[in-house]
A protein has these predicted regions:
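Structured, basic alpha/beta domains of bacterial-type, RNA-associated proteins
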Residues: 2-12, 18-70, 79-136
Length: 136
């Protein structure tokens, strides 16, 4: 096992920010103090589990990962947590093989998604939608 004691990694998605604290342990993963096994909704839990499944039990069962997530919606938070976990595992193992496996599965696990919401403009309800024009 690496000589590192604690590793802090962050992940972002839209407006959600996740900070993961990784330390040697026995495979406990908590998101905002909630164990991953009972984290709701189910879709978000599956999203967070993706890097763990890709990495394999032998890597993450030796670590305790505590994640604090804030901002955004539940899916944005899940993807931010997923990115934080993936980057933490990469930093902990220093494995290029694991990195290529993550990128082949889904690039946004390792590299951030730059897309953001376009600001609203006047003359309509959204960024591009315009108010309906009336001829009478």
């Amino acid at each position: 096992m690496p000589a590192k004691k604690v590793l802090v990694v962050s992940g972002k998605r839209k407006t959600a920010v996740a900070r993961a604290v990784v330390k040697p342990g026995m495979g406990r993963i908590r998101i905002n103090m909630t164990p991953l096994e009972i984290y709701q909704p189910e879709v978000a839990r599956q999203k967070i589990m993706e890097p763990l499944i890709q990495a394999g039990d032998e890597i993450w069962k030796q670590l305790d990962i505590d994640i604090k997530v804030s901002g955004g919606g539940y899916m944005g938070q899940a993807e931010a947590a997923r990115m934080a976990i993936a980057n933490a595992l990469l930093k902990w193992t220093k494995s290029t093989q694991l990195r290529t496996a993550f990128i082949e599965y889904d690039r946004t696990m390792v590299v951030g998604d730059p897309r953001r919401k376009e600001p609203k403009k006047f003359g309509g309800p959204g960024a591009r939608a315009r108010d309906q024009k009336s001829y009478r």
